[in-house]
Amino acid sequence: MAKRYEELTIEDDFMFGKVMEDRELCREVLECLLEGPVGKLEDVQTQREFRYTSDGKPIRLDVYTRDRKRIYDAEMQRLNHQSPEKLELPRRSRFYQSSMDMDHLSKGKSYRELPEGRVLFICTFDPFGLGYAKYSFQNLCTEDKKLYLDDGTEKIFYNCTCDAEDVPDDLRELYEYIRTGKVGGDLTRRIDLAVERARRNEAWRSEYMKELLHDEDVREEGRAEGRAEGIKGTIRICKDFGLSFEETINRIREMFQLSENEVREDMKLYW
C-alpha cells in the first residue's frame, strides 16, 4: 500500500530525490558516501529518464548529477517485499553506468572524453549478505588482482543495516537516520530539515499524488481481474489528498472508463 505524502521519509525514492535537489546538500551526501571530496555540482536531475529507441525499455535514475570530473547516479533502494537476488542490483548497476555513458556520447563527445562514473546504491538491507558496511566494485584482471582496468567506473552498494565501529561517524549517522529517522550530526540534521520542508511543499504533494495515480493506472492496464483493487486503491489516494466525493468519482470514471452509476456503486463500498 502506498504511503501518504506526509509519511514519506528519506528512504522513499520520491522524498530522496526532492531532498537531493538541493545541490549543496546533495554534494555533502555524496562526499559522505564516497568518503572524499566532490566538486561543485553542475546540475542535479531527479527521476531522470533515459530512452534510446522509441520502443526501447526506459530507465529512471533517482539522482543523476555531475561535477567537473565525474558523473554520479545515486539510488535509494528498498527490498519492497522482494529478495536481494530478485532486484538484480549488479546488472542494474551495469545498465545504469552504460546509460550515463550513452547520455554523454549522445552529445557528440568522444569516448576519450568520458568522465569517471560512480553508481551508488544506498540499500536499506545488506545487498550481499556479508555484513560489510559497503561493497565497492571496480574492474580488475582475473589473472593479476593488482592490475586494474582503470576504466574510470566504480559501483558501490551501501548497507544501511551496518553499525560497525570502523564505519566513519558521519556515514554511520547517515545509515542510522535512513533506518530510524534519528538525527545525529550536522548532515543528518540538514537532511531532516529538508524532509520537513518537502512535506510542506504542496506542489510536490500534488506531483506525488499524480505519480501514484499514474502507477495505479499502469497496474490497471495489466490486470482486468484486479479492477476492484485498483479502484479501491485510487479512492484511498484521492481521499488522502483531499479530493471531494464528486471529484473522486470523476477521477475514477476517467481512469477506468466506467459509467457514473458503476462508480457510485464502488464508492458505496470503498469511500
Model-based region annotation:
Residues 1-154, 164-166:
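Accessory alpha/beta interaction modules
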Residues 2-6, 10, 14, 33, ...:
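Short, charged alpha-helical interaction segments and adjacent helix-coil junctions
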